[in-house]
């Protein structure tokens, strides 16, 4: 039997994506100024980034990056366990652990890498199981598959479903893993109830709080702190550095023994170059600002209210989200693509999210807000969405859900 030809395979898959109008494209950003982006020679107001606190271009953050780059160069030049672990890395790990109330922390190159590292290092036996919310981020779900342990999923936010899945897999070590804030819906996991399930079933509870830290909880400490939980209930927690903190990378905070085990055994940590010290210095500055500047969270909360009030007045279907992620359901893919195109024509860049990222029939505009937006910009976006809906609804077989 002849082997499949990989070029023929990818050609067939490409043709299928084209037929389904599911080809993904990259937009080239020429320049950026706060929430404004230059794309194809036009300046657009962006409502699609994860820079929730507006820190990525903040003066102190950029100055810290420039100063460290002038001193330490462009890269770490080695992995953490060779000679790539600089003083800045150690300081950032310590500061984030202290901020979140955890004893220890470990830096990673990205949230995807960190989620893989956690599961590969802790769930190494065939009988081990990771129980997950069905709408968890792809990095959590893919990490389980790559780690080689069993994956069991429960319906979104279904605490009883999580209990059933853990009870149904009594052999081997168990982890219960959940997003804190769900990236496509913007809702928050029932962490207190899930922590009780994990304790009852002797499972380690792991929370990926990529979209919560910096935004929610006292001093922006995230979903876990906002739920009144800590290391006793959530022994491991993921924090990404490329969203509210405006930089790049990720940190896992947790019990000292667990973090030490990751540092000594997690292959994605051991066999990769450490983050550039200059990037780490920028994140150190961002952490200080995120902890100090409650006004950023206050403004963000006000802007979320402005958007939701305006959308409700015009009859839009909102999801149960009080976070900067505000999805507007559009239903069919053709509708959301037409809406997104109409908004861009009006001067706004809003992400169109469609299957397979979200379920069939649940395509949506994913509006994300930043503390740098103004109330006037948010109101202008709402007005533009109303106009786009009116235009699109007049087109055959295209109506908002």
UniProtKB/Swiss-Prot annotation:
BP GO annotations: biotin biosynthetic process
Residues where N6-(pyridoxal phosphate)lysine is found: 243
Gene3D superfamilies: Aspartate Aminotransferase, domain 1, Type I PLP-dependent aspartate aminotransferase-like (Major domain)
Superkingdom of this protein's organism: Bacteria
Pathway named in the protein's UniProt entry: Cofactor biosynthesis; biotin biosynthesis
SUPFAM superfamilies according to UniProt: PLP-dependent transferases
Catalytic function, reaction form: 6-carboxyhexanoyl-[ACP] + L-alanine + H(+) = (8S)-8-amino-7-oxononanoate + holo-[ACP] + CO2
EC annotation from Swiss-Prot or TrEMBL: 2.3.1.47
Cofactor(s) in the UniProt record: pyridoxal 5'-phosphate
PANTHER family the UniProt entry points to: 8-AMINO-7-OXONONANOATE SYNTHASE, CLASS II AMINOTRANSFERASE/8-AMINO-7-OXONONANOATE SYNTHASE
UniProt family annotation: Belongs to the class-II pyridoxal-phosphate-dependent aminotransferase family. BioF subfamily.
Name recorded for this polypeptide: 8-amino-7-oxononanoate synthase
Species in which this protein is naturally found: Xanthomonas campestris pv. campestris (strain B100)
Annotated gene: bioF
């Amino acid at each position: 039997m002849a082997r499949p030809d990989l070029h023929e395979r990818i050609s067939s898959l490409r043709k299928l994506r084209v037929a389904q109008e599911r080809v993904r494209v990259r937009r080239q950003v020429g320049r950026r100024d706060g929430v404004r982006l230059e794309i194809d020679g036009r300046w657009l107001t962006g409502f699609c980034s994860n820079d929730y606190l507006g820190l990525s271009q903040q003066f102190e953050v950029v100055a810290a990056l420039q100063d460290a780059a002038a001193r330490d160069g462009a890269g770490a030049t080695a992995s953490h366990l060779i000679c790539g672990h600089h003083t800045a890395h150690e300081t950032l790990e310590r500061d984030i652990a202290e901020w979140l109330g955890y004893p220890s922390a470990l830096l990673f190159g990205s949230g995807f890498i960190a989620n893989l590292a956690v599961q590969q290092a802790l769930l190494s036996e065939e009988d081990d199981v990771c129980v997950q919310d069905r709408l968890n981020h792809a990095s959590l779900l893919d990490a389980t598959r790559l780690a080689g342990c069993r994956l069991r999923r429960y319906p979104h936010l279904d605490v009883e479903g999580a209990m059933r899945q853990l009870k149904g897999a009594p052999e081997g070590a168990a982890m219960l893993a959940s997003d804190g804030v769900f990236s496509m819906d913007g809702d928050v996991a029932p962490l207190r109830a899930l922590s009780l399930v994990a304790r009852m079933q002797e499972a380690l509870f792991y929370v990926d709080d990529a979209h919560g830290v910096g935004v929610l909880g006292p001093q922006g400490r995230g979903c876990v702190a906002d739920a009144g939980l800590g290391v006793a209930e959530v022994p491991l927690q993921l924090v990404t550095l490329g969203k509210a903190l405006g930089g790049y990378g990720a940190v896992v905070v947790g019990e000292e023994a667990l973090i030490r085990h990751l540092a000594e055994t997690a292959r994605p940590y051991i066999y990769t170059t450490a983050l550039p010290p200059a990037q780490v210095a920028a994140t150190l500055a961002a952490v200080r600002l995120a902890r100090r500047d409650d006004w950023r969270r206050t403004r963000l909360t006000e802007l979320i209210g402005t958007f939701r009030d305006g959308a409700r007045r015009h009859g839009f279907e909102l999801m149960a989200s009080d976070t900067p992620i505000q999805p507007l359901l559009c239903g069919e893919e053709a509708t959301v693509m037409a809406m997104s195109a109409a908004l861009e024509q009006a001067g706004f860049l809003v992400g169109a999210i469609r299957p397979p990222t979200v379920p069939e029939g649940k395509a949506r505009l994913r509006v994300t807000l930043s503390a740098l937006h103004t109330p006037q910009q948010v109101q202008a976006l709402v007005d533009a969405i109303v106009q786009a809906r009116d235009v699109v609804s007049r087109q055959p077989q295209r109506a908002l859900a």
